[in-house]
């Protein structure tokens, strides 16, 4: 009986240690992604500041950023059949920046602005404004390579930049919630009632 209790305790300790090690491993993996998001938020916010200091209209209204949670990364990898050791090679939206604009034409101004920059390289783009998704989702997506410096050296991080208007962002939030509510199959009558999608 006593031996059984000791064995269970040892298994619990081992499991806890393995979990702690996994969390530490993920923290190390995600550190450069955190850095990329922090730096890009500062840079895009500085663009807004420069426009406003010059007394001219800024095509960027708001800057948001995030790094996917560990659970979201694992869930997406499993959904796409990506092995854990291939996640960094095959998932390009671990780091994400969202640029909110007032008007649709501002989005294309921002895209041009990003393409001119020397500190990031556009590797792919998808225009969901001219090619609206069936769900009604609209946004302009860019994947850029962005270089960060850590204590371990230079690393190139893929970052997804989503550019959209306030209205598009509002619909995207609703659409995301509806996808979960209806398990990815939004009924036609719900789409029809959600006139904001256009």
Language-model regions: role of each:
Residues 19-26, 30, 99, 184-189, ...:
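Short, structured coil/loop segments at alpha-helix boundaries
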Residues 94-101:
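Terminal, regulation- and interaction-focused segments at domain boundaries
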Residues 2-92:
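Charge-rich, low-complexity segments
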Residues 88, 101-198:
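Long beta-strand-rich cores associated with HINT superfamily self-processing modules
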């Amino acid at each position: 009986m006593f031996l059984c209790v000791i064995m269970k305790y040892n298994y619990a300790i081992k499991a806890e240690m393995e979990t702690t090690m996994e969390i530490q491993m993920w923290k190390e993996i995600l550190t450069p992604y955190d850095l990329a998001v922090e730096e890009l938020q500062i840079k895009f916010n500085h663009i807004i500041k420069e426009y406003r200091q010059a007394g001219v209209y800024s095509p960027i209204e708001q800057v948001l950023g995030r790094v996917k949670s560990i659970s979201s990364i694992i869930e997406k990898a499993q959904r796409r059949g990506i092995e854990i050791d291939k996640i960094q090679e095959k998932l390009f939206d671990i780091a994400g920046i969202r640029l909110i604009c007032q008007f649709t034409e501002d989005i294309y101004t921002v895209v041009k602005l990003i393409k001119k920059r020397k500190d990031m390289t556009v590797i792919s783009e998808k225009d969901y404004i001219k090619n609206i998704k069936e769900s009604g989702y609209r946004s302009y997506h860019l994947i850029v390579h962005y270089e960060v410096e850590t204590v371990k050296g230079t690393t190139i991080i893929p970052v997804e930049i989503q550019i959209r208007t306030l209205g598009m962002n509002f619909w995207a939030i609703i659409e995301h919630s509806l996808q979960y509510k209806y398990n990815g199959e939004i009924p036609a009558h719900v789409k029809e009632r959600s006139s904001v999608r256009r």
